[in-house]
Amino acid sequence: EGVGSSEKIKEILDKGVPDLRAGLGARVIDTQIYYAEKLGHFPKCQKYIHIYHPDLQGPFEVAHLIWGPDIYYALHDEPDLVHELLDLVTTTYIAFMKELKKTLNDEEDEFCCQWNTLYKGKSCNKE
């Protein structure tokens, strides 16, 4: 459903990047640390059992979840505000992914693992 109003979005923007360990962020990070620690005791398992990031969705999907369906009207009526929210979400997304990457083992050697598929190369993205 989202916050549903421009005023609430402005309040979110004023707060800036949230604490990555607030809410579910801490749970996700701590769970990955736990998995990495447990696998660390079993080098052979660690080599073949890949821990990779959860599906964080994309910046617009996250912005839509924050704002709600009115974000589609805002694209026309308040494009600058939508752009600011997308900037904040993208900045937060990058910071969170960097934090997660500290405990991931999905891009070791010459392969990466995404959604139970092993790909040759360091990343599935061209970027």
Annotate each language-model stretch with its function:
Residues 1-11:
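A contiguous, low-structure linker/loop signature
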Residues 10-20:
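Internal, well-ordered domain-core segments that constitute the primary functional module
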